[in-house]
Amino acid sequence: LPELQQEYSQGSGGTFDPSSPFAWGPKISELANDPTYGGNTDNSYTSQYGKQSGKYYVPQLAAAGMNPWATPQAYNNMKDFFETGVSWSNNVNVAQRFDKGNYSFSLGNTTSNGIVPSTGMDRYNVKMSAEAQLHPNWTTGFNGNFVTSKISKQSTANTSVVATIYNAPVSYNMAGIPSHIEGDPYTQNTYRDSWIDDAYWAVDNNQFSERSQRFFGNAFVKYTTKFGTDNHKLDIKYQIGDDAYTTNYSEIYGYGSTWAPTGEDSE
């Protein structure tokens, strides 16, 4: 993960702004002395709650129904959000050979959990093949593969779920502040006013999936004849094959998404 500065807080021009996407505010160590939000100063919040030594007022905590006073510190929002990706596979294979033929059957599964919460992949594959000698001159066989997979993912590009993670000011605790206001899961509660969904809210409410099914394989018949010796022979082979697949895409934006405020379901 990239290294971020750990000194300056949310805001711009040296002024703290709890709804700013920038990190050009005052030093984090000075937030308790902020004239508007600082717990050490006289302002509307300390008039209501009393002085809060060494702390500052966070409107998003108040909106979530939590204690609105926080101790200034730098957070690693990227490390808190991303998970360790894990992938594992299981395979079973059965094969046997006879005097005049052979067969093989295999079954496999691959499961992956992505680094973004709620993302991953499940894939199953089946393979069958067989070959038989029908006559000293005639051989036939086939092989077929069937693969089915489901991929759970999140939005990308202009609506990327990680946009609010990478750009989050280090003074804002994304993991510790609920992503929606108290009692209303459809109203987002985040550090910026934007058309990009909060990453934690998106993981809980938006769903993007891709389901695919694919079959590919071939069958053949082969005629072999010799001209007196093993080094002089003729093979004639006829083979047909197929490769077909379908993919269904689903995009669901939850009610309250900044991209689709009333929700959206498309396939």
Where are these regions (language model features)?
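Residues embedded in well-ordered regular secondary structure
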Residues: L1-P117, S155-A157, D204-N205, F220-Y223, ...
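Membrane-embedded beta-strand positions of outer-membrane beta-barrel proteins
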Residues: F105, F142, A219, I236-I240
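Transmembrane beta-barrel domains of bacterial outer-membrane proteins
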Residues: V126-M128, K233-G241
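Short, well-ordered amphipathic alpha-helices
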Residues: M128, G217-T224
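Short, solvent-exposed loop/turn and secondary-structure capping segments
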Residues: K153-S155, N248-I252
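Structured, charged N-terminal subsegments at the starts of enzyme catalytic cores
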Residues: V221, T246-Y249
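Solvent-exposed loop segments that connect transmembrane elements
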Residues: G254-S266
